[in-house]
Swiss-Prot record:
Name of this protein: Venom-like beta-defensin
Signal sequence residues: 1-24
Organism: Ornithorhynchus anatinus
Entries under Pfam families matching the protein: Defensin_int
Keyword flag Secreted: yes
Length: 68
């Protein structure tokens, strides 16, 4: 009986912690592109540009160079 209660407690705790941690991971994911001196460039993988992941003026761009 104690083992069953312990098992249910562990399952309950894991189910409560699961969705929140996935949402945090999803929020931290960086976009595939970045804004480099006003131009949208792929971040890391050069193949992203060939697949059209960085269309000009797209929302995926994030400014990395501060405007002076």
């Amino acid at each position: 009986m104690r083992l069953l209660i312990l098992f249910l407690a562990v399952v309950t705790l894991l189910s409560l912690a699961g969705p929140g941690s996935a949402e945090v991971r999803r929020r931290r994911r960086r976009p595939p592109c970045e804004d480099v001196n006003g131009q949208c460039q792929p971040r890391g993988n050069p193949c992203l540009r060939l697949r059209g992941a960085c269309p000009r003026g797209s929302r995926c761009c994030m400014p990395t160079v501060a405007a002076h």
